[in-house]
Amino acid sequence: MLYILKCKSNYIINFHRLPQKTSKALYTNISLSFIYRFMWGIMMKKLLIILIGFILLSSISAIQIDAPQYQPNVIHPGDDVDLWIKINNDNYDNEVKNIVVEVTPHYPFELRQVNPIKGKATISHLNPGESDTVYFKLHVDENAPSRDYRIDVKVSYDEVDKEDGKETSHHYEITKIYYLHVYGIASFEINIDDTSIIPGKTKTIKLDIKNVGTGNAKYLNLYLIGNDKINILGGSLIFVGCLKANNQYIIPIKIYAVPEIEDGIYSINANLFWVGEDGKQYNSTIPLNIRVVKKIYANQPYIYLDDVKNKGDYIEITIGIANRGTTKIKHCVMTLTANGRNYTKYIGDLDEDDYDTSIFEIKEFGDIPIKVTVTYFDDYHNPYNATETFNIHVEKVKKEESLSPMYIIGGVIVVIIIILYIRKRKRHQEFEEFEEI
């Protein structure tokens, strides 16, 4: 049998003129290529027919759906959106009846009840060339990011065809897909890595600005406003630029706390200005709390030996403590330790540049090492302690033997007798002188 095929190169291949093995292999390859090209051509023809069918159906549809109209024109997350859809009967020969318009929203849209059946609106009929508008209401999710979101609009209707006085009804359905743009709104939070500062000091803190909203912020500017206690150093206006939703930007700033500031929380304000995706200008003010902490230094309490007195049977030791810092130290307790024995006194609070003393009585003599420990707290009840040691030497003094009480009484009696004797003798002399006269 003679097989003749025409290839792409327009050559005619005669298999009778080829060797048997070669002609068989070549025939197999060309046959597969031919079958593939043939099937591909059939598929493309079917696809073309389907597309033409859709175009024809669309062009002959009596109903035309206009693009939805909505209010507000700029949709934001959380908005309630009024939606109007206009239905036109573009067939100028036939009437359409039983028109049902259905809206199927996708996230972030949610239907509100404004029609007897949620998401469905009906039009009884439209004459040739007539139109009508149906109304729906949508709610936008508060957390919807900026982008286009889909809604499906399906219209089903009956077209009435009149021929020779006879009415024939044909049912049709049309579905169209529309996209509504939601403009997210930027919103910000600012975190500070370390909010504490010491009076009279300059500190660099980092502001972490995060866009926690649903939209992007363009031309973002940050303006920092200090107060009479906390100052902003190095410029207070900072240009950030564009900050997209869920993105953050870290800004280092320097602040200074005046020396006379008291412990507490002080606010500085961060004013933000930006342009939203909808082209509108926005602003926001965020207070930033700075905690002022007066630091207690290790050498702030000064412990000193004020006086040592030998009282014979005991020693009177006076220990002093002075607050030489700018921060109050609270609930001071002083403990003196001598030869393993503890003597404790409560002092209380010491303001800056204040001092107090405590007197301890111990019955120890000779070389005495003493250790003085003071425990105290700051304004936030954090505990501290300070310790000093002193070496003192006190000799015990022997008391002179005191006179016996009996001797004292006897002496008094003798003195009284002598006085009485002198007085009596003096009177006797006076009497004798009187008799002589």
UniProtKB/Swiss-Prot annotation:
Membrane-topology annotation of the record: Single-pass membrane protein
Subcellular location, record wording: Membrane
Superkingdom as given in the UniProt entry: Archaea
TM stretches of this protein: 47-67
Alphabetically ordered keywords of this record: Membrane, Transmembrane, Transmembrane helix
A GO cellular component entry from the record: membrane
Major location category of this protein: membrane
PANTHER family in UniProt: NPCBM-ASSOCIATED, NEW3 DOMAIN OF ALPHA-GALACTOSIDASE, S-LAYER DOMAIN-LIKE PROTEIN-RELATED
Listed name of the protein: Uncharacterized protein MJ1506
Species name: Methanocaldococcus jannaschii (strain ATCC 43067 / DSM 2661 / JAL-1 / JCM 10045 / NBRC 100440)
